[in-house]
From Swiss-Prot:
Enzyme class, spelled out: translocase
Gene Ontology CC annotations of this record: plasma membrane; proton-transporting ATP synthase complex
Binding residues for ATP: G152, G153, A154, G155, V156, G157, K158, T159
Organism: Cereibacter sphaeroides (strain ATCC 17025 / ATH 2.4.3)
Gene that this polypeptide is encoded by: atpD
GO MF terms, alphabetically ordered: ATP binding; ATP hydrolysis activity; proton-transporting ATP synthase activity, rotational mechanism
Location in the cell: Cell inner membrane
Family the entry assigns: Belongs to the ATPase alpha/beta chains family.
Protein name: ATP synthase subunit beta
Length: 475
């Protein structure tokens, strides 16, 4: 018969497995272990059903699992290896390496379910994190230890922007990064790994000198793995924060898939769906993850989360729930990507809590607001231009439109990671140069330069050089 820590499988419904224990029941969120097709299969307790039965979510495929199979209670939540041993490695949701580089050495492990830091432990200082990307640093700056959302539909450049941020910040940053690939394409995960090796972020010959740990639960994984892999990545990031006391960067691509996986298992667990078919616990699940991503007195976690927007609808419950937790939002717009302007960041929709004169300074704030003012005026004139044409505008409005079109193009920038598409080297622009360049454009100092000179360049010196090249070609 089954003992206290031993149970047996009584029912298998896809990713959900019922297990009966005749002795003491394992606690909610405890990890259970069984063997399926000669492979270790981890289950996580989700519900107590009565009659000594628990309902669990499987962290891997359940094909081949049969009723009566023995199950062992591990006595605590899923625990994963943490610390320097994970640097340069790719782990799955239960902390097993999937990069064929042997087992993860090191003996420190940590449970993936942890309480959020208390108010007393949290740090409240605000400081800008410079990314080197003009449109972000100027109009929606990121704060150290903040949570940043990258919103966008399919194919507008979320993953490319995340890769550029890893590239820019990991190179100039002494801290560690953790990348959690949640329910995204395996090909992209593979590309990212090789790109990190090429750029030196992962040192394949000496893994301990690497700056990043990767945790993957891709599209082909069962929903249990996709619903928990973000927590596994966050657990690694928390350990780096607590042990090294530095600013840790935590990238999630894509937080929507975390919600999607939760909704897939929710119906199997017998919960009545909420709005648009999502799980009724949507806000609770999101809060449990997001509240752990924070700065403490020991160090900080700055997180950048790609958020897929289903059908480009920002009012969908999944992206709308994540809005509440963010310090800055970077909204990627299909209309801007159709103009060929990359990064396709919407300068009027993107926001930041720290775009405040007391944090970023008067000059930065005033230049950012002036840029947004000109772009907003251009947006409101577009209907008139479409119906009546440019000739019907006043001289002042014509000047505003000309400046707005230059600013729009000046907000584009070549990326290092997109060199394969563009053929041009990426540029990182220091914050002071970004502010000075846009201040000069807003004040009309470069009204005489052609629009084309502002497209896909770094600071204003690059614009002047490009204008001279264009003039020489035209001559």
């Amino acid at each position: 018969m089954a003992t206290a820590s031993q149970g047996k499988v009584t029912q298998v419904i896809g990713a959900v497995v019922d297990v009966q224990f005749d002795g003491g029941l394992p606690a909610i969120l405890n990890a259970l272990e069984t063997v399926n097709n000669d492979k270790r299969l981890v289950l996580e307790v989700a519900q107590h059903l009565g009659e000594n039965t628990v309902r669990t979510i499987a962290m891997d495929a359940t094909e081949g699992l049969v009723r009566g199979a023995p199950v062992t209670d591990l006595g605590g939540p899923i625990s994963v290896p943490v610390g320097d041993a994970t640097l340069g490695r790719i782990l799955n949701v239960i902390g097993e390496p999937i990069d064929e580089k042997g087992p993860v050495s090191g003996d420190s492990t940590r449970a993936i379910h942890q309480p959020a830091p208390t108010f007393a432990e949290q740090s409240t200082t605000s400081e800008i994190l410079v990314t080197g990307i003009k449109v972000i640093d100027l109009l929606a700056p990121y704060s150290k230890g903040g949570k940043i959302g990258l919103f966008g539909g399919a194919g507008v450049g979320k993953t490319v922007l995340i890769m550029e941020l890893i590239n820019n910040i990991a190179k100039v940053h002494s801290g560690y990064s953790v990348f959690a690939g949640v329910g995204e394409r395996t090909r992209e995960g593979n590309d990212l790994y090789h790109e990190m090796i090429d750029s030196g972020v992962i040192k394949i010959d000496n893994l301990s000198e690497s700056k990043v740990a990767l945790v993957y639960g891709q599209m082909n994984e069962p929903p249990g793995a996709r619903a928990r892999v973000a927590l596994t990545g966050l657990t690694l990031a928390e350990q780096f924060r607590d042990q090294s006391g530095t600013d840790v960067l935590f990238f999630v691509d894509n937080i929507f898939r975390f919600t999607q996986a939760g909704s897939e298992v929710s119906a199997l667990l017998g919960r009545i769906p909420s709005a648009v078919g999502y799980q009724p616990t949507l806000a609770t699940d999101m809060g449990a993850l997001q509240e752990r991503i924070t700065s403490t007195k020991a160090g900080s976690i700055t997180s950048v989360q790609a958020i897929y927007v289903p059908a480009d609808d920002l009012t969908d419950p999944a992206p709308a729930t994540s809005f509440a937790h963010l310090d800055a939002t970077t909204v990627l717009s299909r209309a801007i990507s159709e103009l060929g302007i990359y990064p396709a960041v919407d300068p009027l929709d993107s926001t930041s809590r720290i775009l405040d004169p007391q944090i970023v300074g008067e000059e930065h704030y005033n230049v950012a607001r002036a840029v947004q003012g000109i772009l907003q005026r251009y947006k409101s004139l577009q209907d008139i231009i479409a119906i009546l044409g440019m000739d019907e505008l006043s001289e002042e409005d014509k000047l505003t439109v000309a400046r707005a079109r230059k600013i729009q193009r000046f907000l584009s920038q070549p990326f290092d990671v997109a060199k394969v598409f563009t053929g041009s080297d990426g540029v990182q622009v220091p914050l002071e140069k970004t502010i000075a360049s846009f201040k000069a454009v807003v004040n009309g100092e470069y009204d005489h330069l052609p629009e084309a000179a502002f497209y896909m360049v770094g600071d204003i010196e690059d614009v002047i050089a490009k204008a001279q090249r264009l003039a020489a070609q035209a001559a």
